[in-house]
């Protein structure tokens, strides 16, 4: 529920319409235990490879399009202001979120903070962790 509230606030701030909000959030139903929620959050450094799942678009589309096994990817976090490649990873995820085939299945949550981190850590089913070894020791 907290994630939907956060998205609603973001959409109001950006003056986006209710249809866009519904399109993006239509699969975020905390009451539906059948939706597999996969999350990635924290710092968007390139060695963490948050967007690796987006590289094979056809495969990702097959994963998220299975009506019997619905999947939603939630991304949240920030890139260091001087990390231009990390900022580009964020932009790639945001662009993907807005495309018709991935809207509502790939979601980026802005304004990452400790409360959002708590919601994600306690609410996602699988934590996405694809770092380049040995640059990341623990997946933080």
Label each region the model flagged.
Residues 1-140:
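Catalytic cores of carbohydrate-active enzymes across secretory and cytosolic contexts
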């Amino acid at each position: 529920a907290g994630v939907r509230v956060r998205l609603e606030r973001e959409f109001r701030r950006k003056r986006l319409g209710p249809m866009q909000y519904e399109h993006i959030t239509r699969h975020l139903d905390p009451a539906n235990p059948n939706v597999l929620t996969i999350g990635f959050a924290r710092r968007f450094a390139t060695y963490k490879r948050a967007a690796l799942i987006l590289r094979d678009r056809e495969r990702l589309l097959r994963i998220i399009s299975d009506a019997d096994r619905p999947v939603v990817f939630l991304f949240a976090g920030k890139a260091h202001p001087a990390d231009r490649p990390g900022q580009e990873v964020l932009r790639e995820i945001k662009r993907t979120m807005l495309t018709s085939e991935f809207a509502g299945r790939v979601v980026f949550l802005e304004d990452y903070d400790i409360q959002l981190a708590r919601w994600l850590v306690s609410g996602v089913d699988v934590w996405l962790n694809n770092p380049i070894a040995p640059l990341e020791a623990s997946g933080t």
